[in-house]
Design a protein with these regions (language model features):
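Extended beta-strand/beta-hairpin segments
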Residues: 36-108, 116-200
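Extreme N-terminal basic, low-complexity initiation segments
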Residues: 1-14
Length: 200
């Protein structure tokens, strides 16, 4: 008999109408590890791209996690041939303010992915972009039980164009958002409030 607390899914794996295509995670015990796999909806005519990173926690201050205040949240993220990213937790959770936290990295990935698609579409449209900056902001809410999730991310890109129609340049942000791999992978609102500047 199914657990009453387990969400119900249709045959296609969707949770209700318009819900995320994700099947209930299945845990397999492999050599002492618990591997949880989420089976998403299948897209037609796709190619897989794989991304591998390593993470090393270097915050053992001598007694490990013997107490909540007895260890550092610092870590390093690495990948072959790339400089390490020095990370920690948000300072609100006893992290190091000078290091990147996971929440900032998520916001940054949305900003960067949108920018890459925007430049691609601008080049295709014959619009010459000479500068692009963004001030992206994310809002996360945390419940009393400590469980948190992102509520929204707003991008504020300022795009400088040398030629082309400024209004056309502005409208390219919509398809850039629709094509952004990261935006398509999150379940919260990602908004864009662009500014277009025409170079002198």
């Amino acid at each position: 008999m199914p657990d009453r607390d387990m969400p119900s899914f249709g045959e296609d794996g969707a949770r209700g109408q318009g819900g995320p295509l994700a099947r209930w995670p299945q845990a397999n015990h492999v050599r002492g590890r618990t591997v949880v796999r989420f089976h998403g909806g299948v897209m037609a005519n796709t190619r897989e791209h794989r991304y591998a990173v390593s993470l090393i926690w270097n915050g053992n201050l001598g007694t490990g996690t013997s107490g909540y205040r007895d260890y550092s949240r610092d870590y390093e993220i690495g990948a072959d041939g790339k400089a390490a990213i020095h990370g920690s937790a948000d300072p609100a959770f006893r992290g190091d303010r000078s290091r990147w936290n996971p929440e900032e990295l998520l916001v940054a990935s949305l900003s960067a992915c949108h920018k890459l698609w925007y430049l691609h579409l601008a080049a295709e449209a014959g619009i010459t972009v000479t500068a692009y900056t963004d001030r992206a902001e994310g809002v996360m809410e945390v419940g009393r039980d400590g469980v948190g999730r992102f509520k929204s991310v707003v991008l504020h890109p300022t795009v400088t164009v040398a030629n082309g129609d400024p209004e056309r340049a502005r409208t390219l942000h919509k398809p850039a958002h629709e094509k952004c791999f990261i935006a398509n992978s999150v379940n919260f609102a990602v908004e864009c409030e662009p500014e277009i500047v025409v170079a002198d």
